[in-house]
């Protein structure tokens, strides 16, 4: 039984590997290894700047406010669940 031409062409196309497009630059791993020493500009950028000292990070206070907010949310949810159960039982 003879196969139609389009089936044989389809099979050969499926068997042959597709050419892959080059990877995008932002998806490639960095070329710079971790063992390479930092340059002078990078070292200068990483140094502590005294002019920026007054704009200190408020990271710890933000964490504390977040924890308090999470606790209050839990208390409100517990109170709502308690009210629902109390109304269902009465």
Curated annotation (Swiss-Prot):
Subcellular location as annotated:
Mitochondrion inner membrane
Keywords tagged on the record: Membrane, Mitochondrion, Mitochondrion inner membrane, Transit peptide, Tricarboxylic acid cycle
Cysteine pairs forming cystine bridges in this chain are none
**What processes does the entry annotate via GO biological process terms?**
tricarboxylic acid cycle
Q: Name the domain of life.
A: Eukaryota
Q: How does it assemble?
A: Component of complex II composed of eight subunits in plants: four classical SDH subunits SDH1, SDH2, SDH3 and SDH4 (a flavoprotein (FP), an iron-sulfur protein (IP), and a cytochrome b composed of a large and a small subunit.), as well as four subunits unknown in mitochondria from bacteria and heterotrophic eukaryotes.
- What is this protein identified as? Succinate dehydrogenase subunit 7, mitochondrial
């Amino acid at each position: 039984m003879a196969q139609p031409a389009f089936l044989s062409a389809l099979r050969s196309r499926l068997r042959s590997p597709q050419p892959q497009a080059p990877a995008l630059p932002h998806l490639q791993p960095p070329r710079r290894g971790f063992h390479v020493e930092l340059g002078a500009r990078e070292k200068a950028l990483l140094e502590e700047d005294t002019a920026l000292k007054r704009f200190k990070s408020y990271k710890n206070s933000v964490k504390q406010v977040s924890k308090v907010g999470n606790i209050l949310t839990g208390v409100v949810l517990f109170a709502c669940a308690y009210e629902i159960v109390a109304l269902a039982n009465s």
